[in-house]
């Protein structure tokens, strides 16, 4: 084999090894997904004690103890959530029902299905499901999920 042929073979082999090493170092590709509130595979769990009876949460993506978790929050028809706040900002879309939200010092928000709402971090708020059907709210949290009551002991 000529020195040119040997050099070419070594370069191709080196590139293949570098490519294989880079691929092995890359994190696993996340899978795309879709979810609906009626998905039977959703695992609904209880809400924190502050929330009303019948409230349920389903984690859609991520880990609620870490940044960037997404969840569905389900409130029974007529249920109200007392004043509380979150360390994280919330980005929300109402999926079902009609919901009123009251953020301290701001005009009342009324959400219908498909409407987006933004809740600033640490801003106290309350909410009520004002429809005759349960309210389902998609929430994207920027940081770990928490619910802090504004009244101590709640």
Predicted regions and their residues:
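Bacterial N-terminal signal peptides that target proteins for export
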Residues: 1-12
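Double-stranded beta-helix
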Residues: 33-36, 126-154
């Amino acid at each position: 084999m000529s020195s040119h042929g040997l050099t070419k073979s070594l370069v191709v082999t080196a590139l293949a090894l570098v490519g294989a090493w880079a691929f092995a170092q890359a994190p696993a590709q996340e899978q795309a997904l879709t979810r609906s509130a009626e998905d039977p595979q959703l695992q609904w769990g209880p809400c924190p004690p502050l929330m009303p009876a019948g409230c349920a949460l389903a984690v859609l993506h991520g880990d609620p103890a870490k940044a960037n978790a997404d969840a569905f929050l389900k409130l029974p028809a007529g249920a109200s959530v007392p004043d509380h706040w979150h360390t994280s900002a919330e980005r929300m879309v109402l999926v079902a029902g009609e919901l009123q939200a009251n953020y301290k010092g701001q005009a009342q928000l009324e959400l219908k299905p498909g409407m987006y709402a933004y809740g600033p971090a640490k801003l106290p708020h309350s909410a009520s499901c004002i429809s005759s059907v349960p309210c389902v709210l998609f929430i994207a949290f920027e940081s770990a999920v928490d619910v802090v009551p504004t009244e101590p002991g709640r």
